[in-house]
């Protein structure tokens, strides 16, 4: 009895596309599994614990010192709290509500930092989202070179642009020493990195989704607000955290463009002045420093789930 060799059946393009998509899905799932295994490995867990302990101990010491009397702060370390626990709220009262030339009076500086940090983080994110979408999905001549130019701006130190920008703000626009000057400066310095990171995320969104929206009659504005922004929330939240923390902790840009005036000066400027008082307000520094990190902690922990999702999405795309 003779055997008949099987005949190779032709495979149409549709089946081939489905096969390729299935293989890509398997590869993506495997890549995600590998990333999760690395993040949950024994060495990764040990490293995370070590980093957490190293970060927590000085933060806890700062928190304890902020409630200790001035005499105890000057004469002993914070670890003596365990043998001689004494608490007081005088440091916070003097830092926030005391008036006078020698007092810290951080309340006005704290509000100035909020007024600077919130727009200083929102403006680059808003402009960066639109620019990243245009560079990723709106074809126009020179888009590639424009993206390379924007990426190259990250190499230029911001210190080189301080004097030219200050001259423009003071001599041309007349806004030196005001909040808009600080907002514009932070927007200019933050935009290149924001555009670069968001472009990488937005360009990885499947084009079939956008094509389906165009078939349904959606224009670029509708696609941007109804598709791109909802899908990019994890990336936007991650970048917003970095931008907000950078603006909140910044001293150089705010000091240059605010002019150092009390009405516009941020919290970091007042902390730098207190550090330079040769220990006169040493007992107020722990309370002042802890007040300065409250807002970044609130922002980070409130957006933590988006931050982790954004990091994982950026690590597994491609």
Where are these regions (language model features)?
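Transmembrane alpha-helical segments of polytopic membrane transport and secretion proteins
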Residues: 1-49, 278-282, 304-318
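A structural signal for multi-pass alpha-helical bundles of membrane permease subunits
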Residues: 44-318
């Amino acid at each position: 009895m003779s055997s008949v060799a099987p005949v190779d059946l032709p495979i149409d393009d549709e089946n081939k596309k489905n096969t390729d998509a299935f293989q890509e899905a398997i590869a993506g799932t495997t890549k995600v599994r590998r990333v999760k295994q690395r993040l949950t490995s024994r060495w990764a867990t040990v490293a995370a614990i070590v980093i957490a302990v190293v970060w927590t101990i000085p933060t806890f010491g700062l928190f304890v010192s902020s409630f200790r009397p001035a005499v105890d702060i000057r004469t002993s370390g914070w670890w003596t709290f365990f043998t001689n626990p004494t608490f007081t709220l005088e440091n916070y009262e003097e830092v926030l509500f005391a008036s006078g030339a020698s007092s810290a009076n951080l309340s006005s500086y704290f509000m100035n930092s909020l007024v600077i940090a919130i727009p200083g983080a929102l403006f680059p994110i808003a402009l960066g989202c639109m620019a990243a979408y245009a560079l990723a999905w709106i074809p126009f001549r020179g888009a590639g070179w424009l993206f390379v130019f924007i990426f190259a701006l990250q190499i230029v130190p911001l210190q080189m642009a301080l004097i030219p920008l200050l001259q423009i703000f003071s001599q041309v626009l007349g806004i030196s020493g005001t909040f808009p000057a600080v907002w514009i400066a932070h927007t200019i310095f933050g935009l290149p990195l924001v555009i670069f990171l968001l472009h990488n995320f937005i360009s990885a969104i499947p084009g079939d989704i956008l094509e389906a929206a165009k078939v349904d009659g959606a224009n670029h504005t509708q696609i941007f607000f109804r598709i791109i922004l909802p899908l990019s929330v994890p990336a936007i939240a991650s970048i917003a955290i970095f931008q907000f923390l950078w603006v909140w902790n910044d001293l150089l840009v705010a000091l240059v463009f605010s002019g150092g005036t009390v009405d516009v000066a941020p919290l970091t400027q007042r902390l730098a002045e207190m550090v330079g008082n040769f220990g006169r307000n040493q007992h107020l520094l722990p309370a002042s420093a802890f007040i300065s990190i409250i807002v970044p902690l609130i922002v980070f922990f409130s957006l933590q789930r988006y931050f982790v999702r954004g990091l994982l999405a950026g690590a597994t795309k491609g």
